A protein has these predicted regions:
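Class I S-adenosyl-L-methionine
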Residues: 1-177
């Protein structure tokens, strides 16, 4: 049985008609930061599964663009996003990598695959996340460390709050069975 509520993701976090735990969170072609809102909702509601098809990621590309000159002086890898088209595409790719690391650091097993063939849609990345009941040899902390390393290496430390690095370090997103 399905029920639908007309509410924002933020309001849904505390909506009295929603249970404390949600089985599945989906976000289909959720533009820009809407996928991040869905992830935050899923984490807050201890979702067992998340099915995400991100779209139009612009936030990370914007930060890359702001720091492009500094990045080019620091690392030859900044050539990956020197040109505007590459900035947009690389920003999109990195956004999804960061999302996957955030999910893994929060106790989810993550698989990334295609939704449909590339000939049908360029926005085609499907992120599947399944909540794990154990930490599997420190996988959460390794993912958290990698998340921090990627943000620092790419000159994106101001995005640590967006990807909840501090909450992950304090264990406030602890997975419960």
């Amino acid at each position: 049985r399905m029920d639908f509520l007309a509410t924002t993701v933020q309001e849904a976090l505390t909506h009295p008609d929603l249970p404390a735990r949600i089985d599945v969170v989906t976000a289909l072609h959720a533009c820009d930061t809407a996928t991040d809102d869905a992830i935050a909702f899923g984490l807050a509601k201890h979702a067992s599964h998340m099915v995400l098809v991100p779209c139009c990621q612009a936030e990370v590309a914007g930060v890359l663009r702001q720091h492009k000159a500094l990045s080019l002086s620091r690392s030859p890898l900044a050539e990956l996003w020197r040109h505007p088209l590459h900035t947009r595409e690389f920003g999109s790719q990195i956004t999804n990598v960061l999302r996957c690391l955030q999910l893994e650091a929060s106790g989810y097993s993550v698989t990334v695959t295609e939704l449909v063939g590339w000939e049908h849609s360029m926005k085609n990345e499907l992120i599947l996340a399944r909540r794990m009941t154990d930490d599997r040899h420190g996988a959460r902390e390794r993912a958290r460390q990698r998340l921090v390393q990627v943000l620092d290496e790419l000159g994106l430390p101001e995005l640590k709050a967006r990807f909840a690095v501090d909450q992950l370090a304090s264990g406030s997103s602890t997975v419960t069975a």
